[in-house]
Amino acid sequence: MRLDRLTNKFQLALADAQSLALGHDNQFIEPLHLMSALLNQEGGSVSPLLTSAGINAGQLRTDINQALNRLPQVEGTGGDVQPSQDLVRVLNLCDKLAQKRGDNFISSELFVLAALESRGTLADILKAAGATTANITQAIEQMRGGESVNDQGAEDQRQALKKYTIDLTERAEQGKLDPVIGRDEEIRRTIQVLQRRTKNNPVLIGEPGVGKTAIVEGLAQRIINGEVPEGLKGRRVLALDMGALVAGAKYRGEFEERLKGVLNDLAKQEGNVILFIDELHTMVGAGKADGAMDAGNMLKPALARGELHCVGATTLDEYRQYIEKDAALERRFQKVFVAEPSVEDTIAILRGLKERYELHHHVQITDPAIVAAATLSHRYIADRQLPDKAIDLIDEAASSIRMQIDSKPEELDRLDRRIIQLKLEQQALMKESDEASKKRLDMLNEELSDKERQYSELEEEWKAEKASLSGTQTIKAELEQAKIAIEQARRVGDLARMSELQYGKIPELEKQLEAATQLEGKTMRLLRNKVTDAEIAEVLARWTGIPVSRMMESEREKLLRMEQELHHRVIGQNEAVDAVSNAIRRSRAGLADPNRPIGSFLFLGPTGVGKTELCKALANFMFDSDEAMVRIDMSEFMEKHSVSRLVGAPPGYVGYEEGGYLTEAVRRRPYSVILLDEVEKAHPDVFNILLQVLDDGRLTDGQGRTVDFRNTVVIMTSNLGSDLIQERFGELDYAHMKELVLGVVSHNFRPEFINRIDEVVVFHPLGEQHIASIAQIQLKRLYKRLEERGYEIHISDEALKLLSENGYDPVYGARPLKRAIQQQIENPLAQQILSGELVPGKVIRLEVNEDRIVAVQ
């Protein structure tokens, strides 16, 4: 017999049998070795064959291993083993059986038949296990489906559906699929397309996360429950596992061979199987190399003839990119658009999924948490879709609560650390013999025993609370199993089992759960096992950096005295500070328009009066850092071509992948202060971009992504009209001056731009009385730098007055003050410190001497 007439699987099994004989120190390769190798072969035909013939393959494996251990062992074979006479006889018999059946190659299942017909130990073991020529022959016919073995890889193609698909209807029967709430219209439309005579292949198209895969799972559940038209009853929904199909296909044609096996198996099912291909676009081009056919082209004939009932799922972008390009493939599918559900629909979906997540995380999810997850995710997470983002919020909030339950409570942890600290001190004091140490040791022992008692009491309480939580968990799991069992009983029409569960077990479990939940509510002191809206807000704040949680008392107080906080840094600009503070308060109180930025302001005024400083102070107030501000110098955007830098280069231009300067900054930090400095210097086209931001709170970048500006404060600064402010300051009141300045502004900016700004704020020129306060603020920064080096410094009132006079210039505002501090204080101080005149540790006093500020110690 020629070994090259064996199928690939049979050849591999023969090699494994040789290895097994060597490992057992046997002189010959016996039929037992080959049978053991065939039984243990991954993806082999023998194990499923025996199972379908009603033989226990596990028990047979044990019997064969025992027989192998009884075979004679020979030492010093030198790694040379030969096939035994028995094995050669059985293999020749296999060849004879293959020829009788008209096979071109010998497949491994014929070995079982040949072993039964020959005499020997293996035949006896097989017969003892219940194998007969009749039942093995019948199982072979069933496995082959009336086909001959005309290909060396024929065995790999067998049971292709089992290997390369996942049975969704089976998973639905076992209750492993999440319930599908709503989506009735999409499921009905899918069923409608599946009922067609030809081209009965729906493709579900929608954004990522809207629930395309869930619709197919819903279809599988409806088929199981018999809630489908007659034409679909009893069908199976199989999901194609593209990973398994491609994995390990090393040689040209191996992938196509597997796919052909799947298609052949589907053709044999005669329309009883609906194939679900998730990420349908992966089929286009899969397996293509140097002119070879790809998977998409192999599917076309089966799809057109109606042999293959297929449901695809893909996103809008990928459908356009891959499937629309191939018109022949596109026409074979019927589009079913899956839209994003509304907030109300999402709440219904979350209520349906609630029990599954409670069961997984062992926590309780409250209804306010569900409502908060749907509404907050819709409001604050713009770049993802419902219900996916809301489900993720619930999942992560439940996970964080579970983590707290599993870890030691803070109170216990604090006591534990204190006990360790006391024990260390106790060890040190035990080595001392003086009276004070003994007295301290007695006190310490008393405190230690007290803390240990507290710890043990708390630990008992913690363990009891954990136990009560796990008790409710067990009841919930039992209840879930009972609900699955009642569904299974309903499908098979087992009325006795249904009534037993419906009126006996389920009400009893529900009663137990209610009692356990009430007990839990009373006793919980250390552990929280409820997910509330506060936890949802906390998780969302962690994701986006947007503070959506309920305001703490401290934050309320902080917001109410926001003006005072800002006045610590910005002197003499009451109108500007009030306008900004009111905008922030409106936003945090939830009264601001949700579709516009928190606030948009145009700050007008001469140079050096605090326009940029107010932005920094606001960023510091909101985010505790001056750096938490997106600062864009608009003088960089004076040319027309530089405008695209804000939103990103268009397709086809260099830098398209990099994104925009403004849009990327806001995508990364959606809650921020955006400062557009010297806005009048920008090219007029920049204002066209800003119109969209100021009105709708959103902007589309170069790659077509929508960036959300609704949680930003947009501040633009400009020097327009500053000459008027300088001239008329003191003559007119604020309202008149603002009117004059707005006249100048309206000549430079278009009406639709000015109209969209919340407030135009005019800054006053600074008076001499303001400069003294600003001098103190700037000197505090100098004091801080000197303190770090060990110097303490005080300034006299005369020195402060002189500094304010020297640093005051009505045209340049507070900027000359910085230069005055540098020249009159910092320069002399630096010289004196370096020369050693001023030493650390002593107070430095700044005083006036002959119209000069001098430092003395």
UniProtKB/Swiss-Prot annotation:
Result of altering W543F: No effect on chaperone activity or ability to form oligomers
Impact when changing E279A: No effect on oligomerization
Consequence of changing L97Q: 75% decrease in chaperone activity; retains ATPase activity
Induction, per UniProt: By heat shock and other environmental stresses.
Sites of N6-acetyllysine modification: K96, K176, K640
Effect on the protein upon substituting Y251A: Decrease in ability to disaggregate proteins due to decreased substrate-binding activity. Retains hexameric quaternary structure and ATPase activity
Region Repeat 2: start-end pairs: 83-146
Effect noted on mutating E254A: Decrease in ability to disaggregate proteins due to decreased substrate-binding activity. Retains hexameric quaternary structure and ATPase activity
Database matches in PROSITE patterns: CLP_R (PS51903), CLPAB_1 (PS00870), CLPAB_2 (PS00871)
Spans annotated as NBD2: 555-765
Renumbered residue ranges of the record's region Linker: 341-545
GO biological process: cellular response to heat; protein refolding; response to heat
Keyword Methyltransferase assigned: no
Binding site for ATP 2: G605, P606, T607, G608, V609, G610, K611, T612
Record localization: Cytoplasm
Keyword terms: Acetylation, ATP-binding, Chaperone, Coiled coil, Cytoplasm, Nucleotide-binding, Repeat, Stress response
Self-association state and partner proteins as the record states: Homohexamer. The oligomerization is ATP-dependent.
The record's note on its domains: The Clp repeat (R) domain probably functions as a substrate-discriminating domain, recruiting aggregated proteins to the ClpB hexamer and/or stabilizing bound proteins. The NBD2 domain is responsible for oligomerization, whereas the NBD1 domain stabilizes the hexamer probably in an ATP-dependent manner. The movement of the coiled-coil domain is essential for ClpB ability to rescue proteins from an aggregated state, probably by pulling apart large aggregated proteins, which are bound between the coiled-coils motifs of adjacent ClpB subunits in the functional hexamer.
Functional summary from the UniProt entry: Part of a stress-induced multi-chaperone system, it is involved in the recovery of the cell from heat-induced damage, in cooperation with DnaK, DnaJ and GrpE. Acts before DnaK, in the processing of protein aggregates. Protein binding stimulates the ATPase activity; ATP hydrolysis unfolds the denatured protein aggregates, which probably helps expose new hydrophobic binding sites on the surface of ClpB-bound aggregates, contributing to the solubilization and refolding of denatured protein aggregates by DnaK.
Family the UniProt entry places it in: Belongs to the ClpA/ClpB family.
Name used for this protein in its record: Chaperone protein ClpB
Taxonomic source organism: Escherichia coli (strain K12)
Lineage: Bacteria, Pseudomonadati, Pseudomonadota, Gammaproteobacteria, Enterobacterales
Gene that produces this protein: clpB
